[in-house]
Amino acid sequence: MYMSTDEVRNAFLKFFESKGHQIVESSSLVPHNDPTLLFTNAGMNQFKDCFLGLEKRAYTRATTAQRCVRAGGKHNDLENVGFTARHHTFFEMLGNFSFGDYFKEDAISFAWEFLTDVLKLPADRLLVTVYETDDEAFDIWNKKVGVPADRIIRIGDKKGGKPYESDNFWQMGDTGPCGPCTEIFYDHGEHIWGGRPGTPEEDGDRFIEIWNNVFMQFNRHADGTMEPLPKPSVDTGMGIERISAIMQGVHSNYEIDVFQALIKAAAEVIGYEDLSNQSLRVIADHIRSCSFLIVDGVMPSNEGRGYVLRRIIRRAVRHGNKLGAQGAFFHKLVGVLADIMGTAGEELKRQQAVVEKVLRIEEENFGRTLERGMAILNEALDNLDGKVLDGETVFKLYDTYGFPADLTNDVAREREFAIDEEGFEKAMEEQRQRAREAGQFGTDYNAAIKVDTQTEFCGYVGTKGSSSVAAMFVEGNEVDSLSAGDKAIIVLGETPFYAESGGQCGDAGEIRTEAGVFRVEDTQKLGNAIAHHGVMAEGVLAKGDEVATIVDAERRAAISLNHSATHLLHAALRQVLGEHVTQKGSLVKAENLRFDFSHLEAVTAAELKEVERLVNAQIRRNHVIETNVMDIESAKKKGAMALFGEKYDDEVRVLSMGDFSTELCGGIHASNTGDIGLFKITSESGIAAGIRRIEAVTGEAALDAIEAQAAKYEEKLAESAQKAKTLEKELQKLKDKMAAAESANIMGKAVEVNGTKVLVAALEGADSKNLRTMVDDIKNQMGSGVVLLANVTDDKVGLIAGVTKDLVGKVKAGDLVKMVAEQVGGKGGGRPDMAQAGGTDVSALPEAIKTVQPWLEERL
């Protein structure tokens, strides 16, 4: 019975839902608050605290289709990806989980029922393994399910290993929850080489593990003793790629529908025909991990998770380059992936444009150095005396050309060389040491503090309260009392002080007794406790003292306004820039707010203006800011946005501002949006690849910012006006010089009328002021004579006449200019020696000028 990968996923979840399991969404590929994990690599990661008894949920049975990545740290499959049938950087793990609910019998029965009744797998193609001493599991398989004893294989501890070191015994660590497991294998047939589990040929590809059921039934102590857990649990995992291969009648995972669609698409965009090429497998695998890492907020960088992403992208690009790819190709596969992933690709579809852009930019950046780096690498390999490339060269390729060591290793391996990994690590460590020496770091006493107290937060309803001192610490050491001047951390049983979370900074204020005052400068979370950081301002304080808690209400109010403004800003950015915008971080203080978000290019001035307008419009609408507590699923149905990387309880606080913004948030907020008063963006910048930052202020600080901006504009305007005046003066000087030069040029056009010099001319491009200057210059040059100059500007005629003083008894400038003006539809007049006129009939000007000489002949 053929089933697509999407159908297998849906069938699995639906089956376990029918068995009373809660379908839980795949958690982020970025583990929440688990520094031991680089990426989510198993279905149980998000339930770790449930198995450890540290967290209780509303359900005791769960099922998931968890997205996983193994490409860095301990679980690093990168170098094998594309070269084996079942190694991937990205895979989906189908799982069902019991938290102190059902145990072995139900888990085994569920697994068998799903495989044989739902998927219709033939029972004679299945065999199972159990831990050597797990008679209970053996009997369930044999007597309850009916699997023949010869198809149930007992697996013991590894030879020479520690007790319980076995493929069929799971342990979280040296101590803690552990237990046996049973694995289900599928027999691909005699035509494929390989032996049954537990035989020397078990690493062959005939018998493939498809499902592992872990039974957590013991608590292992430091001395090695095993204590039965009061409520044993179940953790199972089945790789969707492996079971899909079986359902689609193929042997290699790369032959299933998901990979075949990606391989064909990659071949098409590259222009390559051989679909069996291993480089196409690499590209098909890598587009999955890269796309979903970006969806979950990881961006290419030179450190941590971002560097792993960059390594995978560059490995894919290099394999495309091997196949002859011209230009950027990798990002073109995102749409194909989103479609083929079916129901699991919905979030990728929503963020498709962002994912494509991140990949394209990274690919183009690497493409500029790939050719040069490959040339240097190939030259180094060509000139090698031995078969090992030195670590210094590997480091140079990494440091200068962005070649991750595993990419260099790939190329070297293809040419049957190895790399000096130890030498590379030495060079890397030297670089890290230089970086460490360049920085100065103090002691983090807070990291060493362990507190058993669980502090109750009562600050949603007020800024004052009373409590008792549960614990006090000075420089990381617990103390029983404090005296004036001591810098310390105080833990209370109950507090109105908000601990920094979700970007909102911690409260400040005072903790008082009749005997002393502790000034709280910051408030932080410390496990389940709330830590008040500060200094003993006066008097003394002892453990167990009853205290009054007083939050700085004015500061708290300012912070709450800015926090509410960040919610409006987030919603406005999504409206203006697109729904790909997600919060990547924030800092909310009393003075201002800072908001980091995903966007691949600088926000334009017009976009920032529109964001500001939208936020201020919502402030003016004065929405009531409503807070409702509901279960997480109801919150999601309501459309509440969740913060990237945040972990939420089953019961969450949903903050709504009209129909404009709905978010999950545990912070302190204003009562109405109108309380914010005014919102003003002060800066926008890029802080990392694909991450932008906006800084802003509200209320009086926003007014101050606007006034400061207005003053700055006024200053710039005054500077511009002064510059304009200076330029105008300089321009006039230049025009005067040009007029003087023009005057000298046209003197040659002067004629004599009855022994008197006369100059009549029409000039292009001269303004009236220039004409007057030119008339004066010409009169001075003539000594004795008559001048009439004309110009045309804006379809109007300008006329200026000049007569030297010795001739004003015979000819008056006003009469001359009036005579000409009347012919061009105008009028004018002036002094006997200088007169000005204008007209509107430009076409009549040439004939009017011709009448000047006859008119003068009659008077001179």
UniProtKB/Swiss-Prot annotation:
Pfam families: DHHA1, tRNA-synt_2c, tRNA_SAD
Location, primary (coarse class): cytoplasm
EC number(s) reported in the record: 6.1.1.7
Gene Ontology MF annotations: alanine-tRNA ligase activity; aminoacyl-tRNA deacylase activity; ATP binding; tRNA binding; zinc ion binding
Cofactor binding mode and count: Binds 1 zinc ion per subunit.
Disulfide partners: none
PROSITE patterns for this protein: AA_TRNA_LIGASE_II_ALA
InterPro entries membership: aa-tRNA-synth_II/BPL/LPL, Ala-tRNA-lgiase_IIc, Ala-tRNA-ligase_IIc_anticod-bd, Ala-tRNA-synth_IIc_core, Ala-tRNA-synth_IIc_N, Ala-tRNA_ligase, Ala_tRNA_ligase_euk/bac, DHHA1_dom
A cellular component term, taken from the record's GO annotations: cytosol
Domain notes: Consists of three domains; the N-terminal catalytic domain, the editing domain and the C-terminal C-Ala domain. The editing domain removes incorrectly charged amino acids, while the C-Ala domain, along with tRNA(Ala), serves as a bridge to cooperatively bring together the editing and aminoacylation centers thus stimulating deacylation of misacylated tRNAs.
Protein name: Alanine--tRNA ligase
The organism of origin for this protein: Vibrio parahaemolyticus serotype O3:K6 (strain RIMD 2210633)
